[in-house]
Design a protein with these regions (language model features):
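Nucleotide and nucleotide-moiety/phosphate-recognizing core
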Residues: 1-161, 166-185, 190-192, 198-200
């Protein structure tokens, strides 16, 4: 399998942060988004950013900007689809997604996802961590996605499907278990941002 392309999902509305782009919030010497870029670019062949609205606000990052192709705010699957369409144009087989508001995700995210996908015709794997109540908790914005299923995903979104795990389960998606739940800590509130600073 060719090395996946990377797609950072930054299409959320950030309502609990007062709106705007969470990825552009300061963290350490950079931003949430720059932290995510630094971690992901070491693991993928090339990278793009899924975001809607004025693309010039991300110009400093020098990445292709992929807007959602499905009208309305329909959630992360629309960003996945935008990434799959971009990857298809590059001749790639798969993408790995990461969320722009989750700066501490594992540095071995991609190798673990690829390992979990061995033997799959259409590699489809979500990151997961141990959960005391549910056994495991899946992290649907962190996954390995096959370009071959992009038209099926488009049809599902046009039909109203929004929940990531419903679609992945329909296609026999697997989970890749990561031991550290804190690695998937995401910033949703000002308090979360303060905690992220303390975690540096």
């Amino acid at each position: 399998m060719k090395q996946p392309l990377g797609v950072i999902l930054a299409g959320g509305q950030a309502t609990r942060m007062g709106g705007g782009d969470k990825g552009l919030l300061p963290l350490g010497d950079g931003t949430l988004l720059s932290s995510v870029i630094d971690r992901l670019e070491q693991q993928v062949a090339d990278m793009a950013l899924n975001a809607n609205g004025d693309a010039t606000r991300f110009a400093a990052f020098d990445l292709p900007i992929l807007p959602d192709s499905i009208d309305g705010f329909v959630g992360p699957l629309a960003g996945v689809l935008a990434g799959l369409d971009w990857a298809a144009a590059q001749g790639a087989d798969t993408i790995v997604t990461a969320a722009a508001d989750t700066p501490f995700f594992p540095c071995d995210l991609v190798p673990h996802l690829l390992l979990a996908s061995e033997g799959m015709t259409h590699p489809l794997v979500l990151a997961a961590t141990p959960d005391a109540k549910r056994g495991t908790a899946r992290h649907p914005t962190f996954g390995l996605w096959p370009v071959a299923l992009r038209d099926d995903l488009r049809t599902a979104l046009q039909g109203g499907l929004r929940k990531v795990v419903l679609w992945t389960d329909q296609h026999g998606g697997r989970s890749a278990l990561f031991p550290d739940e804190a690695a998937f800590f995401n910033v949703n509130t000002p308090d979360d941002l303060a905690q992220a600073e303390r975690m540096l």
